[in-house]
Amino acid sequence: LNEDMISYEGEIKQIPNTIEAFGKREGKVNEQRPTTYEEGPWMYKRNNLYYLFFAAGPISEHIGYSTSKSITGPWEYKGIVMPTQGGSFTNHPGIIDFKGKSYFFYHNAALPGGTGFTRSVCVEELKFNKDGSIVQMNMTEGIKKSLTPLNPYAKTEAETIAWSEGVKSMKNKVVGNFITAKYNDAYTKVKEV
C-alpha cells in the first residue's frame, strides 16, 4: 500500500484459507468452508509480529486472529479474541494505537432496536500477553474512563460526535472535512476521547 493509502505496488497476494491459518470450523462439516474465516479481515503489526483479525464462524460470528512474522505468511491461527455475544449475528474488528495503548473496535446490537443490521460500534482496550498472544475479551458497555476531554473550541482532526441532530458532513479545500447544521436548531454533542 502506498503513502496515499489508495494505490499499491506489486501483485495482490492471497492468503490460503487453510485450517493452520484460520482454525477448523466447528459444527456441521462443509467441505467448501473448512475454516473459521468468514469475512472482514483487519491487518495489524506490533513488535515485528503481524496480526490478522477476522470475523469467524460459523454464524453467529466471533472474532478470531492469526499471526505471522511476515505479512505474506505463513499464518498460524491463534484462537478467539472475542466470543459470540451481543445479539448481532455478525461482528467485525478494527484495531488502532492511540496515546500508548491499543484499542479494539467491534460492533454489537446493544442499542435500542439493535439487530444484525442495525449495529452499534463499541471499543475495548486490547491487551497482549508477554508472548504476543491476545488476552481474550468479552463485550462490555465500553470504556468507562476517558483518556482526555475534548476542547469544543479547538479544531479536532476528526468529526467526533457522541450524538447529533440535523447535521451533515461536508468537505472543502480550505477546511477539509467538517460538520454543518442543516437547520437552525441542529446540534452535536461532544464527549471525551
Region spans (language model):
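Carbohydrate-active catalytic/glycan-binding domains of CAZyme proteins
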Residues: 1-192
